[in-house]
A protein has these predicted regions:
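Short strand-coil-strand connectors
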Residues: 4-8, 72-74
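Short, well-ordered secondary-structure micro-motifs
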Residues: 4-5, 89-91, 164-167
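Short, hinge-like loop/turn segments at secondary-structure boundaries
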Residues: 10-11, 171
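Mid-to-C-terminal secondary-structure elements
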Residues: 13-39, 43-148
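Peri-transmembrane interface segments
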Residues: 119, 146-181
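A hydrophobic alpha-helix feature that marks transmembrane segments and, especially
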Residues: 172-200
Length: 200
């Protein structure tokens, strides 16, 4: 999603969320503040920028506070800049995200009535399998999936790590295959030249 300030436009991932997000993700503002309950209730046009987005648009991250950016052809005021965090378990760069109130996104920006994902923060004593089953049951009921396959997926941090490992293994395997093919083609080329030289 493009975000613009003056003549500068950068691409960002918009994350529409609640004020509880920093506590759930252990990811907090370095400058300014995060989204407040009043922002959510009043559908305020405010955003919190990831560090890299703030740097690309305004230079020093702290200079982004109070400035306006253009998203969805609407003006939003920057109220905070997040701390540097790097990539998450899925490989997404969290410093290139932009946060806005969920209500603002759904009603004023995207005009949609559904959400694409939810983070759950579990108590250490919680049974992960029970939580997964209960969450799945709620989603299946809400999505009217009786007798049908799930139209959603649930990932734990361990699942994300496994998916990332499998993706890296696939890349390494493809790299090894490519190297082998290149070596074989190169060997055939050398053999052809040697045969030609012998025939000559």
């Amino acid at each position: 999603m493009p975000v613009r300030s003056g003549n500068i436009t950068v691409t960002t991932q918009i994350l529409a969320t609640y004020p509880s997000y920093p506590g759930i993700r252990s990811f907090h503002p370095e400058h300014g503040r995060f989204l407040a309950e009043t922002d959510l209730m009043d559908m305020e046009r405010v955003v919190v920028l990831g560090r890299k987005i703030a740097e690309r648009l305004f230079g020093a991250p702290e200079s982004a506070l109070g400035r306006e950016v253009l998203i969805f052809r609407a003006r939003f005021t920057v109220v905070g800049v997040m701390e540097a965090k790097g990539r998450d378990l899925t490989g997404a760069d969290q410093d290139e995200q932009t946060f806005m109130p969920l209500s603002t996104y759904m009603r004023r920006a995207a005009n949609q009535t559904w959400i694409s994902g939810v983070y759950l923060h579990l108590d250490e004593r919680a049974d992960l399998d029970q939580v997964r089953q209960a969450t799945g049951a709620i989603l299946r009921a809400r999505h009217h999936l009786e007798g049908k396959k799930d139209d959603f997926s649930m990932l734990t941090p361990a699942d994300s790590m496994q998916l990332r490992k499998e993706a890296l293994d696939l890349v390494q395997t493809l790299g090894a295959i490519t190297s082998t093919i290149s070596f074989a083609v190169g060997g055939m080329g050398i053999l052809s030249i040697m045969v030609l030289m012998v025939q000559a």
